[in-house]
């Protein structure tokens, strides 16, 4: 089955992807937990060289919130999602394809006045959604970084 999803289904997926992005950018890991499917496909090949075909949501939260990744309190991000296309792949699964720009700034200290490093990624992302108990949940992502600005490759880890 591959078809255009109903408008209500797309709206449900848009709500989930919005909350996913806002959760990342505000570091609101409790909010993130509310929109995740129980298991997820995480293809971070271009981000950290790893892929998880079936990651429990309870494992994704510590990955995302790790201080060496998005949980760094000195790191500010904006996951901006542009135009999207949607494909219904089963009664309870939808795939989204999006234009994406993710801005990153890491500050020198907790005063958040001096930018120590910045790096922005441009490209797309494939996202997956599953309907769980009648609600569309964020079930994974695969960023496609086509190009980057500044020091994107230095945004994460011990740098």
Curated annotation (Swiss-Prot):
Pfam families: Scytalone_dh. Pathway: Secondary metabolite biosynthesis. It is an enzyme of class 4 (lyase). The active site is at residues 79, 104. InterPro entries: NTF2-like_dom_sf, Scytalone_dehydratase, Scytalone_dh. Induction: The expression of the dibenzodioxocinones biosynthesis cluster is positively regulated by the transcription factor dibT. One of its GO terms (molecular function) is scytalone dehydratase activity. It comes from the Eukaryota. Its EC number is 4.2.1.-. One of its GO terms (biological process) is melanin metabolic process. Keywords: Lyase. Homotrimer. Each subunit contains an active site, located in the central part of the hydrophobic core of the monomer, which functions independently. Belongs to the scytalone dehydratase family. Dehydratase; part of the gene cluster that mediates the biosynthesis of dibenzodioxocinones such as pestalotiollide B, a novel class of inhibitors against cholesterol ester transfer protein (CEPT). The biosynthesis initiates from condensation of acetate and malonate units catalyzed by the non-reducing PKS pks8/GME11356. Pks8/GME11356 lacks a thioesterase (TE) domain, which is important to the cyclizing of the third ring of atrochrysone carboxylic acid, and the esterase GME11355 might play the role of TE and catalyzes the cyclization reaction of the C ring. This is Dehydratase GME11372.
């Amino acid at each position: 089955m591959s078809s255009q999803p109903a408008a209500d289904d797309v709206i449900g997926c848009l709500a989930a992807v919005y909350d996913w992005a806002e959760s990342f950018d505000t570091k609101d890991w409790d909010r993130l937990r509310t929109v995740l499917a129980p298991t997820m496909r995480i293809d971070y090949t271009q981000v950290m060289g790893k892929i998880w075909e079936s990651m429990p949501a309870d494992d994704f939260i510590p990955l995302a919130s790790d201080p060496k990744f998005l949980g760094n309190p000195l790191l500010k991000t904006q996951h901006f999602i542009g135009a999207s296309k949607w494909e219904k792949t089963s009664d309870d699964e939808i795939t989204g394809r999006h234009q994406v720009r993710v801005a990153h700034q890491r500050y020198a200290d907790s005063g958040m006045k001096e930018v120590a490093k910045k790096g922005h990624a441009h490209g797309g992302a494939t996202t997956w959604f599953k309907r769980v108990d009648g609600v569309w949940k964020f079930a994974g992502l695969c960023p496609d970084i086509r190009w980057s600005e500044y020091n994107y490759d230095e945004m994460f880890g011990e740098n």
